[in-house]
Amino acid sequence: MWLGVITLFPEMFRAVTDFGVTGRAVKNGLLELHTWNPRDFTHDRHNTVDDRPYGGGPGMLMMVQPLRDAIHAAKAAAGEGAKVIYLSPQGRKLDQQGVTELAQSSRLILVCGRYEGIDERIIQTEVDEEWSIGDYVLSGGELPAMTLIDSVSRLVPGVLGKQASAEQDSFSDGLLDCPHYTRPESLDGVDVPAVLLSGNHEQIRLWRLQQSLGRTLLRRPELLQNLALTDEQTTLLAQFVEAMNKYA
């Protein structure tokens, strides 16, 4: 996957290129990330990248000319078919379904705003989609861009050691993930559930599915409203609720 990022702080993206799953993907050639800094496209000796908004008010906007030139440079490098995304609190909220959709694109250009945002005409003429990571205020689009890159890259074939890792992640099937355990078998008197030590793969599968359903019901019940549960899932969830009520 090819990724281009428009940012005033390209150094921040070393967190993506140098560390963890994404860093390994870059090293292995599965992920290619380039940055364009609007400061490199300025024409004054101060490298000015902000400007006053028409109509007054607090704060500044990103200056149009350097930003637009940076986007054009990224588009030229990406070639035909690249999708331009602006990280914005007004955008569609990123969820696993959205991540899956974005992962279908082989080339993405991410525009990271700063200050009070960017000129609306840039959004109208240069941006294909706006995406948000949540209803809260951040200082810029870099952290949302890194969040998007991390989540999307996990779905690129070969990035994870095992594809099952992505398939079993929380939200991959609309449910929260089940609890996980490692050694020791007993920790401060709390034992690993016996079924996980049984070696019975079908029973382990059913337990994990039931725990995912139950955890989703308890922590994010609204997610279940969007799912068409199978007969197996419905039965497992009913058993979970029955057991929970029994010991309540």
UniProtKB/Swiss-Prot annotation:
Its EC number is 2.1.1.228. GO terms for cellular component: cytosol. Its main location: cytoplasm. Signal peptide: none annotated. It catalyses: guanosine(37) in tRNA + S-adenosyl-L-methionine = N(1)-methylguanosine(37) in tRNA + S-adenosyl-L-homocysteine + H(+). InterPro entries: Alpha/beta_knot_MTases (IPR029028), tRNA_m1G_MeTrfase_C_sf (IPR023148), tRNA_m1G_MeTrfase_TrmD (IPR002649), tRNA_m1G_MTases_N (IPR029026), tRNA_MeTrfase_TRMD/TRM10 (IPR016009). NCBIfam families: PRK00026.1, trmD. This is tRNA (guanine-N(1)-)-methyltransferase. HAMAP family: TrmD. Belongs to the RNA methyltransferase TrmD family. Specifically methylates guanosine-37 in various tRNAs. It is an enzyme of class 2 (transferase). GO terms for molecular function: tRNA (guanine(37)-N1)-methyltransferase activity. Keywords: Cytoplasm, Methyltransferase, S-adenosyl-L-methionine, Transferase, tRNA processing. GO terms for biological process: tRNA N1-guanine methylation. Homodimer. S-adenosyl-L-methionine binds at G113, I133, G134, D135, Y136, V137, L138. It is found in: Cytoplasm. Pfam families: tRNA_m1G_MT. SUPFAM superfamilies: alpha/beta knot. It comes from the Bacteria.
